[in-house]
């Protein structure tokens, strides 16, 4: 009797293990199918590289409020702390578009990445010094360190500031790609000055760090949204981009109607600043999609690092 019981137990165990094995294989197959489908959807989506700055606000609002989805276009924002990471994604063709500046775009062109500008943006930058460094004017940057992102508008603006100051000693340009790292270096007294966009510039000013130069005073409009040229030549992609720009314009209207502070929670979430910074932001006006000025394109193209 015990012999038969032992045999029955063995058979049941084998059957159980076999069913477990089948279940595990089924789960593996299902996971693979889900991964393949997710990859297919991601490949078909319109992917745009962004950074945590105010020129990206219309995109962040549209994503957060599902406005792209409601317009029937799958837009996926690839969020990075630096333009360089977005460049890498664009270079590997894992993104169709990027929020960038005209200097950076020219650098990408030299690397063989042809871009089409679909709109300019309201991006701006300020050269802000560390109050501990006691740099209150440009000529005091002599023998100081300025944090910039290489091959970008920040490097061009730093060069403009330094050249105009005619300092007695060399000014050292320190390459810090991540915009929030540049901000932290100012706040932690680790750098003498930095080129910062909004909202990082506002946060730096709140800590009494002086502004030495503002790109808005130079009549420079260097911010752009661009897509790879080959993407713009694809019929399906062109339709996606058309819908993207329609949503962009509608979002711009909403921002101008309600003001940027109305979207404080989204600014906090996507840009990593507190409400104190949000409430201190300057008044900003966003514009509908419009091509960048030829003078700004030429200025970006002329810059040689």
Give the label of every model feature segment.
Residues 1-8:
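Bacterial N-terminal signal peptides that target proteins for export
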Residues 56-59, 155, 241, 264, ...:
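A general structural signal for well-ordered alpha-helical segments in protein cores
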């Amino acid at each position: 009797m015990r012999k038969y019981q032992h045999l029955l137990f063995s058979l049941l165990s084998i059957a159980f293990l076999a069913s477990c094995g089948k279940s595990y294989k089924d789960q593996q197959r299902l996971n693979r199918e889900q991964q393949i489908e997710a990859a297919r959807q991601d490949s078909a989506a319109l992917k745009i590289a962004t950074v945590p700055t105010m020129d990206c606000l219309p995109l962040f609002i549209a994503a957060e409020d599902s406005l792209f989805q409601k317009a029937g276009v799958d837009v996926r924002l690839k969020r990075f702390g630096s333009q360089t990471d977005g460049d890498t994604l664009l270079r590997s063709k894992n993104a169709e578009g990027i929020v960038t500046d005209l200097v950076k775009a020219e650098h990408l062109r030299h690397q063989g990445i042809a871009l089409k500008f679909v709109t300019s943006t309201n991006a701006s930058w300020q050269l802000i010094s560390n109050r501990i460094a006691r740099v209150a004017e440009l000529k005091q940057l002599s023998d100081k360190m300025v944090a910039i992102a290489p091959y970008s508008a920040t490097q061009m603006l730093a060069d403009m500031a330094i050249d105009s100051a005619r300092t007695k000693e060399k000014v050292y340009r320190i390459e810090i790609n991540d915009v929030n790292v540049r901000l932290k270096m100012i706040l932690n007294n680790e750098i003498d000055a930095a080129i910062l966009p909004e909202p990082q510039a506002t946060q730096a000013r709140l800590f009494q760090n002086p502004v030495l130069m503002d790109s808005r005073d130079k009549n420079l409009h260097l911010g752009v949204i661009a897509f790879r040229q080959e993407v713009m030549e694809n019929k399906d992609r062109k339709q996606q981009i058309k819908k993207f720009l329609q949503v962009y314009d509608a979002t711009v209207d909403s921002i101008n109607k309600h003001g940027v502070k109305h979207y404080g929670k989204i600014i906090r979430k996507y840009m990593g600043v507190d409400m104190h910074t949000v409430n201190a932001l300057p008044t900003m006006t966003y514009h509908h999609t419009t091509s960048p000025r030829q003078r700004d394109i030429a200025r970006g193209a002329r810059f040689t690092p």
